[in-house]
């Protein structure tokens, strides 16, 4: 059987505002981009009554049997959208879990994109968005991996990537609980992205923004604050900000050289922490 390899890239929240609360979830708006760090998904058709899913790699431990990939396949089977085809799927996890980089959600989105590209899955846009929402709120963001503006009304605008920034991403040995972080939100921000524009991805514009979840995470996890405080001192960083609900802290740079120098400084200070 032919085997396919799919790259599933990590996402970063360049900025995130919590605007209010809906019935079940908080209403947020965010600026999102994708980076070169990726998981690898290997897929092949098999003759079996069931799909087979395996996780390997450094960050494959403690992944539940009920995960974004199993949920996706169960939903597709329930709707008979795979025509009874079964697959063996192996995911090499290079993206840390609980890091705020949407590893699991992007795995599901990348697999959906692949199935559509190979005409294995034929689905209309409305049904596709509904499918993504059933798996996880971030999945829809990965269906087109370009600079993305998520408005508080749920609308998504994709933008052309015109400016390359280089990132130093540091994650401590622990992850942050998304549910816990959001449960501590007590105040809301005014909407800033109602009128999405390309200029929102310009470094000087991004520098003035925030991640509303960051202060909550820093209070809950003091060791995270120590990491961020050091990263702010790294020479020539444009800005430093947590992605998603953490626990990854990201420093942004104009040049690869400055980013590489910062990496060396960080590893000398925090050698035990994961960093790229």
Question: What residue ranges belong to the model's regions?
Answer:
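ATP-binding N-lobe of GHMP and related small-molecule kinases
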Residues: 1-99, 116-126, 151-153, 161, ...
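Hydrophobic C-terminal alpha-helix "anchor/cap" residues
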Residues: 32-35, 76, 132, 231, ...
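Short glycine-rich phosphate-binding loop at a beta-alpha junction
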Residues: 90, 239-243
């Amino acid at each position: 059987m032919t085997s396919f390899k799919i790259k599933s890239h990590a996402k970063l929240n360049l900025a995130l505002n919590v605007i209010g609360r809906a019935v079940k979830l908080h209403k947020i708006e965010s600026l999102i981009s994708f980076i070169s760090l990726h998981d690898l998904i290997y897929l092949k058709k098999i003759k079996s009554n069931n799909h087979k899913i395996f996780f390997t790699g450094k960050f494959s431990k403690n992944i539940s049997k009920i995960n974004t990939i199993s949920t996706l396949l169960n939903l597709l089977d329930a709707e008979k959208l795979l025509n009874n085809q079964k697959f063996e799927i192996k995911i090499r996890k290079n993206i840390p879990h609980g890091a705020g980089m949407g590893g699991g959600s992007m795995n599901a989105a990348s697999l959906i994109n692949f199935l559509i590209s190979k005409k294995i899955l034929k689905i209309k846009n409305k049904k596709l968005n509904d499918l993504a929402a059933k798996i996880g709120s971030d999945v829809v963001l990965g269906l087109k991996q370009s600079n993305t503006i998520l408005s508080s009304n749920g609308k998504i605008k994709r933008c052309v990537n015109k400016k390359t920034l280089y990132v130093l991403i540091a994650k401590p040995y622990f992850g942050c609980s998304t549910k816990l972080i959001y449960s501590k939100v007590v105040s809301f921000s005014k909407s800033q992205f109602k009128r999405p524009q390309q200029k929102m991805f310009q470094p000087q514009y991004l520098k003035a923004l925030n991640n509303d979840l960051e202060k909550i995470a820093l209070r809950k996890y003091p060791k995270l604050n120590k990491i961020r405080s050091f990263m702010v001192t790294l020479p020539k960083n444009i800005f430093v900000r947590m992605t998603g609900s953490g626990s990854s802290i990201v420093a942004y740079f104009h040049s690869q050289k400055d980013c590489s120098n910062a990496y060396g400084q960080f590893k000398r200070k925090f050698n035990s922490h994961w960093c790229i």
